[in-house]
Structures are given as C-alpha cells and as structure tokens.
UniProtKB/Swiss-Prot annotation:
Homodimer. Mg(2+) 2 binds at D26, E28, H184, D189. Binds two Mg(2+) per subunit. The active form of the enzyme binds two Mg(2+) ions in its active site. The first Mg(2+) forms only one salt bridge with the protein. Its EC number is 3.1.13.-. One of its GO terms (biological process) is tRNA processing. Belongs to the RNase T family. It comes from Haemophilus influenzae (strain 86-028NP). This is Ribonuclease T.
Length: 229
C-alpha cells in the first residue's frame, strides 16, 4: 500500500486546494509598475502537509536581483525598502537566474506533492504575482508552474479571520512574532506570510471548518463506489 493510500484523503496536500500547490512569495521592487519598474528581490517558500493534515513551511529560495535593462528605478521605493542597488555585497543575480531557480524549486515541490499546478500565496497578492509574471515574460523562462491569474491573498484571508489586513497586525493576531526592523526584506516577509497562511489553514481545521461536511459526504460516496468496483 502506498503512502498516499495510507494517509486520509483530506490530509494530503494535493486534495486540500483542489490540486494546487501553494507557494508563498514576496517581492521587493523599485516601483509599482510590473512591466516598467525593476524587480529587486524575490523570496519563495513551498509548503508541506503532515500526516495529520497540518500545513508547514518547507523549502525556500531567495534572490537579490539586478534591474533589467531599461528598468525604471523610483528613488522613493528604494528609500521605503532600504535597498541599495549599487551595493556589491547584495550578490544580485539576473532576472533569468532568479526566475529559473524559482520555477525549478516550485516544480520539484509540485511534483513531490502530486499536485497539478502551483498557485501564488502572498500578502496583497496581485502585486507580487504581477511582478513574477512580468519577469517570467521578460526572461522567456518556459514551463511556468503558476496559475496565470489565480492566487491566495493572505491580506483578504486575514481580514476574514482576524479583521486585520496589515501583515504585522495579522501576525500579532495569530501570535506570530514580527520584527518591524526586518520588514520589507523579501525573505523575512515571506517567512512571516508562510507562518500566517499555515496558521490560518490549520486553525480552520482545528475549528472544524475543514473538511467541510459536504465534501466529507461526497468523498465517502466516492470511496464507496471505488470499493464496489
């Protein structure tokens, strides 16, 4: 008997989000226009589910990125995120290397979880998704694992669960430590967002909100049919 057969249906990651593999992402940029402004930093964390159906952070990648040729650089954005694009200690790589590395990590995790496609999870996710997709288009990296427009927005989810939409406030509500001095570092914000998303998914499970009774009944019917065949 395989591991997936031994683990209950709803405790398998591939069955939690309709076949989607969730990947937490945060970006730091030189503006708000994904087509014109530079992508300067990107971090991503994949997730795994244990045999009891609880979600946990898993693999991570993090890149400082060189502005693409002709990119706009908004000084106000650099002042906000504290990035010095001329600092040689950044160890910045090209967009091509960053997106290639991201996609490779995500595809491996997606395959290991037996998921059909990956989906971006981010705080105010439209922003992060737009920059990832624009960079993928610029670089021409093939086999983009992400859904082209679907996403999970932790700002919306936290607003529903806690009445808080700001990341630090949502983390505080979930009793997740948050160091404001490290905020606006893509890696730190991704780590906090990953913990927040896992907390919300796991807390919903603890409250009895998942699996929903209707989906449980449907799964029982499916299992009965398979057993009868």
């Amino acid at each position: 008997m395989s591991d997936s057969q031994e683990i209950p249906y709803h405790n398998q990651l591939k069955n939690r989000f309709r076949g989607y593999f969730p990947v937490i992402i945060d970006v730091e940029t030189a503006g708000f226009d994904a087509k014109k402004d530079a992508l300067l930093e990107l971090a991503a964390i994949t997730l795994k589910m244990d045999e009891n159906g609880y979600l946990h952070p898993d693999q991570k990648c993090h890149f400082h990125i060189k502005p693409f040729e002709g990119a706009n650089i908004n000084p106000e954005s650099l002042k906000f995120n504290g990035i010095d694009i001329h600092n040689p200690l950044r160890g910045a790589v090209s967009e091509l290397d960053a997106i290639t590395g991201l996609f490779q990590m995500v595809r491996r995790g997606q395959k290991d979880a037996d998921c059909q496609r990956s989906i971006i999870v981010a705080h105010n996710a439209t922003f992060d998704q737009s920059f990832v997709m624009a960079a993928a288009e610029r670089t021409g990296v093939k086999r983009n694992p992400f859904h082209p427009f679907g996403m999970f927005d932790t700002a919306s989810l936290a607003g529903l669960m806690f009445g808080q939409t700001v990341l630090v406030k949502a983390c505080q509500a979930a009793k997740i430590p948050f160091d404001g001095k490290q905020a606006h570092s893509a890696l730190y914000d991704t780590e906090r967002t990953a913990k927040l998303f896992c907390y919300m998914v796991n807390h919903l499970k603890d409250l009895g909100g998942f699996p929903h009774i209707a989906s449980e009944l449907e799964q029982e019917k499916t299992t009965e049919k398979e057993t009868a065949l």
